[in-house]
UniProtKB/Swiss-Prot annotation:
The lineage of its organism: Bacteria, Pseudomonadati, Thermodesulfobacteriota, Desulfovibrionia, Desulfovibrionales. It comes from Nitratidesulfovibrio vulgaris (strain ATCC 29579 / DSM 644 / CCUG 34227 / NCIMB 8303 / VKM B-1760 / Hildenborough). Its main location: cytoplasm. This is Translation initiation factor IF-3. The gene is infC. HAMAP family: IF_3. Monomer. Pfam families: IF3_C, IF3_N. IF-3 binds to the 30S ribosomal subunit and shifts the equilibrium between 70S ribosomes and their 50S and 30S subunits in favor of the free subunits, thus enhancing the availability of 30S subunits on which protein synthesis initiation begins. One of its GO terms (cellular component) is membrane.
Amino acid sequence: MRRDVPQDSVRRNEQIRAREVRLIGAEGEQLGIISRNDAIALAKEKGLDLVEVAATADPPVCRVMDYGKYKYEQQKKKQEAKKRQTVVQIKEIKVRPKTDEHDYQTKLKHVRRFLEEGDRCKVTVFFRGREIVHKDRGLTILDRFVEDTKDLAKLDQEARAEGRTLQMMLAPIPKK
């Protein structure tokens, strides 16, 4: 790790390497291209820091500002962005082709709750033994789930067979 660049990779004051910089004042006004030392002196005179805003520009763009305040605002923006992120989980419900009505209703209630919470839901019909011959029963159950949740969900992934299972994915309809 290089010592002249701080952890957050924003150069300030003496860490700026360029001889000349395009300077932006504390209120956002353009001060033109001046030498780095003059810019640092100007910033120190105002009790502020010279912060490199755009290092790739030619000459680099630097701004006179309070570095501590700038760093604090960047941290707040990062926290706010992190807060707005939503983690979508995939919940799975497993049923069998011989699932009775009451059990189906219970599973349906769970699927509806998952979708209301904003999670995607994978519905899996798994077959045992010779049940695999009756894939049509599994497809009927999956179609019934789609029909019973059409007010909350859209079909995200069509029913597909994988080994001894039939699977489909339901995604919640975005709320307006």
